[in-house]
Curated annotation (Swiss-Prot):
Annotated Pfam families: SapB_1, SapB_2
Cysteines joined through disulfide linkages: C5-C78, C8-C72, C36-C47
SUPFAM superfamilies with a match to the protein in the record: Saposin
Protein name: Saposin-C
Source organism of this protein record: Cavia porcellus
Keyword Transcription: no
C-alpha cells in the first residue's frame, strides 16, 4: 500500500467520522479542512497534498455514498482488490 493510498483512506474515514453520516457538501469540505491538522507533522503534509489535489473529487464521491476504499481506488490512489 502506498503512503498516498493510506493517507487517502485516512482522510476519507476521518471525514466520514466528522460528518457523522450527515453528507452535505459544506460539511464534507469543512471536515476536509480540519482532518490533516489531527495528524503528526510527518504525515500531515501527505494528507494536505491529498486534500489539495483530490478534495473536490473526494467531496463528489462521498456525496455518492462511497466507502473510503472505493473513493481512493476511484481516484487511482489505491489498487482495488
Amino acid at each position: 500500500e502506498s503512503v498516498t493510498c493510506k493517507a487517502c483512506e485516512y482522510v476519507v474515514k476521518k471525514v466520514m467520522e466528522l460528518i457523522d453520516n450527515n453528507r452535505t457538501e459544506e460539511k464534507i469540505i469543512h471536515a476536509l479542512d480540519s482532518v490533516c491538522a489531527l495528524l503528526p507533522e510527518s504525515v500531515s503534509e501527505v494528507c494536505q497534498e491529498v486534500v489539495d489535489t483530490y478534495g473536490d473529487s473526494i467531496v463528489a464521491l462521498l456525496l455518492q455514498e462511497m466507502s473510503p476504499e472505493l473513493v481512493c481506488s476511484e481516484l487511482g490512489l489505491c489498487m482495488s482488490g
